[in-house]
C-alpha cells in the first residue's frame, strides 16, 4: 500500500528535528506532496510531524 503525504502547515517555529524529518520525507515547500510505501519507518516519521502534514491512501 502507498500513502501520499502533503505538507499543509509551515514548519517555521517548530523544532529543528521536525524540520529534518520533513526534509527526509521529501517535503520542502507548503503544498508539496510525496508518495511513499506504507512502512513502519515512514509511519514513525509521519507521527513526529503529524500536526504539519496530511496523509491519504493512494491506490496502486
Curated annotation (Swiss-Prot):
- SUPFAM superfamilies in the cross-refs: Ribosomal protein L30p/L7e (SSF55129)
Q: Which UniProt keywords apply?
A: Ribonucleoprotein, Ribosomal protein
Q: Name one GO cellular component term.
A: cytosolic large ribosomal subunit
Pfam families cross-referenced by the UniProt entry: Ribosomal_L30
Q: Quick check: keyword Magnesium in the entry? A: no
Please give the biological process terms from Gene Ontology that the record holds: translation
> InterPro entries per the record?
Ribo_uL30_ferredoxin-like_sf (IPR036919), Ribosomal_uL30_bac-type (IPR005996), Ribosomal_uL30_ferredoxin-like (IPR016082)
User: Which GO molecular function terms does the record list?
Assistant: structural constituent of ribosome
Entry keyword Ribonucleoprotein? yes
Q: Which PANTHER family match?
A: LARGE RIBOSOMAL SUBUNIT PROTEIN UL30M, MITOCHONDRIAL RIBOSOMAL PROTEIN L30
Q: How does it assemble?
A: Part of the 50S ribosomal subunit.
Q: Which family does the entry's similarity section mention?
A: Belongs to the universal ribosomal protein uL30 family.
Kindly provide the name given to this protein in its UniProt entry.
Large ribosomal subunit protein uL30
Origin species: Desulfitobacterium hafniense (strain DSM 10664 / DCB-2)
Its taxonomic path starts at: Bacteria, Bacillati, Bacillota, Clostridia, Eubacteriales
Amino acid at each position: 500500500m502507498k500513502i501520499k503525504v502533503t505538507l499543509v502547515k509551515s514548519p517555521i517555529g517548530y523544532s529543528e528535528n521536525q524540520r529534518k524529518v520533513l526534509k527526509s520525507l521529501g517535503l520542502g515547500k507548503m503544498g508539496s506532496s510525496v508518495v511513499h510505501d506504507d512502512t513502519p519507518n515512514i509511519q514513525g516519521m509521519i507521527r513526529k510531524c503529524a500536526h504539519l502534514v496530511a496523509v491519504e491512501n493512494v491506490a496502486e
